[in-house]
Structure formats: C-alpha cells, structure tokens
Amino acid sequence: MDSSFNLAIHALVCLSHSGRSLSSEALAENICTNPTRVRRVLAGLKKAGMVETREGLDGGYRLTADPASLSLRQVAEAVNARFVDCAWHSGDIDRDCAICSGMAGVMDTLYRNMNEECAAYLSHITITDIETQLFTQK
C-alpha cells in the first residue's frame, strides 16, 4: 500500500475542520509533504465528487461531500488503495506440482479477501469520526 490513502484522509479532515477552501500548499504544509503530491492524490477525490477546486484569490480545494457520511471505504476506493498486495508470486503455474503451480492463486485469493475485510471495516468509519478522534484524544 502506498501513502495515498493516508494523505487523502489527512486532507479531507483538514478541509472538514477548516470549513473553507485550502490551497494545495496549505494542505501540503499540514500533511508534511509537497503540493504536487497533494494535487495528485486530490485529483482522485475530485473525480469521486468529494472535493472541488477553485481558482483565484479564494482558490484551492473545498470539501463537497458530507464528512459525517463520507466513509473511509469511499476514500480508499477514490484513491485505488489496496491494503494488502504482493507483486511477487512464488511458484510456477506451469510446473507439475500442486504446491508450486497453485500457491500464487491461493495467495491472490487470500489477499483479495483481506482487502475486502479491510474495506468492510472502513465502511463504518467516517471523516467526521476521524476528526472527532483527533480532537477528543487525551
């Protein structure tokens, strides 16, 4: 998994908390990354209808989705987050051995199921929930 999911949640909480438009520079400063990375990730959120952009003096990103109903699953889907992924596969499907030829398929199913479990868990957590946790921590 890359950091896009974390960055997206951080940006959405900032936008929710501020209640106004924020530039990619302002978001990047709070997230501790560069504005180009923010713009790249927020492009996915814009495409999903979660944020909008404005140019000009009051320009920047503005939250358009209701943070109380915007689930982390929706955010994950907007940035194409995969929580469990493995690019390398052991074995060889062309070998005459059940273990060697079957392991990649079994592991792919395992990873897919784990991603589905993560998505189901995240569907119960909203941007407002994260914001509330941040401001009620002791």
PLM regions and their residue ranges:
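N-terminal helix-turn-helix DNA-binding core of bacterial DNA-binding proteins
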Residues: 1-33, 62
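Short, structured loop/turn "capping" segments at alpha-beta junctions
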Residues: 21-23, 52, 128
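Basic amphipathic alpha-helical segments that dock to polyanions
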Residues: 41-46
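Non-DNA-binding regulatory cores of transcription-related proteins
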Residues: 64-138
